[in-house]
C-alpha cells in the first residue's frame, strides 16, 4: 500500500492551503495511508534535538521521510518565507543583504546555490535529497524564478513543476550567466 508522510511547518493562516491539508486530501483520494509530522520550525536546536531523541512518533515519521522513494516539495521566496516564519525584521534584512533569494526545507539559498541560513528543522534538509529516489520541486510564478533557480543550484532536483512565466525567467537568468 502507498504511504505518504506529510511534513509541514504550518506556515500561514489559511489552513485549506497548507501542505498538510493538501497532502492529507491527496493521500485519501489515492487510497494511501498517511502520517503527519507536526514540529514547528521555530523551536530551538536544543528542544528539536530533545523531541527527536525522546518522541518515538516524531522519530519514526522522520525515518520514513528520509527513506522516501519520491519527494514532492515546495520552493519559496526567501523574503516571503522569512516573514511567514516570523523572523525578526532586522534578521530578514541581513538575510536578504547576504543574498538569500530562495528557500526550501527552512534553508535559505543565494542565486548561485550557496546556503545562507538554515532554520532548525525536523525532517529533511537539502543535503538529504541525494538519498531520495526522485525529487520533485514545485513552484510557480515569475516572482519565484530566482528562488527556484537558487534551490536547483543548491540541491538535486530531478523534476521541476512550474509555470511558463517562471520557466521563461529561469531560462533568461541562465542565458545571462
Indicate where each model-derived feature is located.
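Short, small-residue-biased leader/transition segments that mark boundaries at the very start
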Residues: 1-6
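Conserved phosphate- and dinucleotide-binding cores of soluble alpha/beta proteins
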Residues: 10-177
Amino acid at each position: 500500500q502507498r504511504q505518504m508522510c506529510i511534513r509541514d511547518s504550518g506556515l500561514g493562516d489559511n489552513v485549506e492551503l497548507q501542505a498538510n491539508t493538501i497532502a492529507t486530501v491527496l493521500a485519501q483520494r489515492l487510497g494511501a495511508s498517511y502520517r503527519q509530522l507536526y514540529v514547528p520550525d521555530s523551536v530551538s536546536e536544543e528542544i528539536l534535538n530533545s523531541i527527536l531523541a525522546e518522541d518515538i512518533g516524531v522519530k519514526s515519521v522522520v525515518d520514513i521521510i528520509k527513506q522516501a522513494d519520491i519527494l514532492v516539495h515546495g520552493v519559496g521566496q526567501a523574503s516571503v518565507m522569512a516573514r511567514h516564519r516570523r523572523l525578526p525584521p532586522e534578521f530578514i534584512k541581513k538575510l536578504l543583504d547576504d543574498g538569500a533569494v530562495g528557500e526550501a526545507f527552512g534553508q535559505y539559498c543565494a542565486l548561485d546555490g550557496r546556503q545562507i541560513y538554515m532554520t532548525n528543522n525536523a525532517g529533511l534538509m537539502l543535503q538529504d535529497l541525494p538519498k531520495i529516489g526522485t525529487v520533485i520541486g514545485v513552484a510557480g510564478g515569475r516572482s519565484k524564478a530566482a528562488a527556484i533557480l537558487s534551490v536547483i543550484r543548491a540541491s538535486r532536483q530531478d523534476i521541476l513543476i512550474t509555470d511558463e512565466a517562471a520557466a521563461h525567467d529561469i531560462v533568461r537568468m541562465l542565458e545571462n550567466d
